[in-house]
Design a protein with these regions (language model features):
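Conserved class I S-adenosyl-L-methionine
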Residues: 47-106, 108-115
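Class I SAM-dependent methyltransferase SAM/SAH-binding core
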Residues: 120-166
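A short acidic, Gly/Pro-enriched loop at the edge of an enzyme's catalytic core
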Residues: 168-176
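A short SAM/SAH-binding and catalytic strip from SAM-dependent methyltransferases
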Residues: 175-191
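A short glycine-rich, Lys/Arg-flanked "PGG" loop and its adjoining helix->strand segment in the class I
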Residues: 194-206
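SAM-dependent methyltransferase
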Residues: 209-277
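C-terminal lobe and adjacent flexible extensions of AdoMet/dcAdoMet transferase-like proteins
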Residues: 273-331
C-alpha cells in the first residue's frame, strides 16, 4: 500500500469548486460537474480521489466490507455535504471543552488528529493553542478540512495516510492522538484494527494518550437504533440511520434536505471489544465516557469516548506536579 501526502494548499480552491447536482439514489450517487477546468488543469485533474463523485459498491453493496472502502465512499459530493450533518456550531456546543480539558489536564501540547474529516477537531484544538497535525486517509476530506481551516484564518498541516502504515508518513512522536467521529469503525478486519492501534501506540511519546470514540453499537445491535442528534451529528435537517445491520456490518444511509442520499459501510464495534483491543495494544489504562460524561447509563449513551494512557505512572507524576486541581479533572 502506497501512502500519499496531499497538497491541500491547492486541493480545491474556492474558485475551482465545481457546481454540483445530485442525480442518484442511495445505491449509486452521481454528481454532475458543470464547470470546465482551466487549460492548465486544476488539482481535481491531478488527484484521482478529488475527481471521484460517484459511490461504487459493486453488484452487492452488503458484501463490500473492505477496510479501504471508505476512500470510495467519501466522494467529493458527499464530503461537500458532510458539514450539514455535523453542524459545527451545534457540535461545539454539545461537546463543550471536553477534549480540550482532557488534553490540558494531561499536560499535552502536540496532537495528531488521525481522523481529521472536514477538520472540526483540528480547527478547535488549533484555536485552543495546540500544535496539530491533521491526518486522514481521504484526500477529499483533507481538502475540505484545509478549506474550512483557511476560512477561519488557520493553515492546517495535513497528511494523507493509512493508519496501518501511519509511521511511514509522519515524523517524530506526539503527546496525544485523537481518532474521533466514529472513524475506527471503518476498519472491517480485526488485524487492521490491531495494526492501526499498534501504529498509534508507536507514534506516541512514552507518556502519550489516545482518545478514540465510537457509536454505541451495543445498544444498536441488541435493541435497535435510535438517535436524538444530540452529539457529533447535530445537523437536524439530515437523516442518518442504518438501512442494514448485522454483527459484521452497519450500513448507514444519509439523506440530505435536497434528497441526495449517500451510504457508509461500517463495522459495528462493541464497547468492551474496543477497550480490550486498546489494552492489548499496550495501553496501561483505558477510561470510557458516555456522551462526554464519566457516569452514564449504557443504554442511553449515543457515543463512547475511550481515553487510553500509554504510561499510567508518568501521567500520575504529571498530575501530582500540577497539583490537586488537576487531579479533580474528569480524565
Amino acid at each position: 500500500m502506497r501512502l500519499h501526502v496531499v497538497d491541500t494548499h491547492r486541493a480545491i480552491p474556492e474558485k475551482e469548486h465545481p457546481a454540483q447536482r445530485c442525480v442518484g439514489t442511495s445505491k449509486t450517487v452521481r454528481v454532475e460537474n458543470h464547470e470546465e477546468t482551466s487549460k492548465s488543469g486544476s488539482s481535481l485533474d491531478r488527484n484521482p480521489e478529488l475527481q471521484s463523485f460517484q459511490q461504487n459498491y459493486g453488484e452487492d453493496p452488503l458484501a463490500d466490507r473492505a477496510t479501504d472502502l471508505y476512500r470510495r465512499e467519501f466522494v467529493m459530493g458527499f464530503v461537500e455535504k458532510w458539514d450539514e450533518l455535523i453542524d459545527w456550531d451545534a457540535r461545539a456546543e454539545s461537546e463543550g471543552q471536553f477534549f480540550i480539558d482532557v488534553l490540558r489536564a494531561h499536560g499535552k501540547a502536540s496532537v495528531l488528529d488521525a481522523a481529521t474529516g472536514t477538520g472540526f477537531h483540528s480547527v478547535r484544538l488549533m484555536e485552543a493553542g495546540f500544535d496539530v497535525i491533521s491526518v486522514d486517509g481521504s484526500a477529499a476530506m483533507l481538502a475540505k478540512a484545509f478549506e474550512n481551516g483557511r476560512k477561519r484564518g488557520l493553515i492546517l498541516k495535513t497528511v494523507q495516510s493509512d493508519w496501518r502504515e501511519l509511521n511511514r508518513s509522519i515524523h517524530g512522536k506526539y503527546d496525544a492522538i485523537i481518532c474521533l467521529g466514529n472513524s475506527f469503525t471503518h476498519l472491517h478486519d480485526e488485524q487492521d484494527r490491531r495494526k492501526a492501534l499498534a501504529e498509534f501506540y508507536a507514534a506516541l511519546r512514552h507518556d502519550g494518550i489516545l482518545i478514540l470514540d465510537q457509536r454505541n453499537y451495543d445498544e444498536m445491535l441488541d435493541h435497535g437504533f435510535s438517535s436524538k442528534h444530540r452529539y457529533y451529528y447535530c445537523g437536524d435537517r439530515v437523516t442518518a440511520a442504518p438501512e442494514y445491520l448485522d454483527d459484521g456490518l452497519a450500513r448507514f444511509k444519509y439523506t440530505f434536505p435536497d434528497a441526495c442520499e449517500y451510504t457508509l459501510n461500517m463495522f459495528p464495534l462493541r464497547k468492551n471489544y474496543v477497550r480490550r483491543l486498546i489494552r492489548e495494544a499496550g495501553f496501561e489504562l483505558v477510561r470510557t465516557y458516555g456522551d462526554f460524561q464519566e457516569t452514564y447509563h449504557e443504554s442511553e449513551a449515543e457515543f463512547f469516548i475511550h481515553v487510553a494512557e500509554k504510561s499510567v505512572t508518568s501521567n500520575l507524576r504529571l498530575l501530582d506536579r500540577r497539583g490537586p486541581a488537576s487531579r479533580r479533572t474528569k480524565v
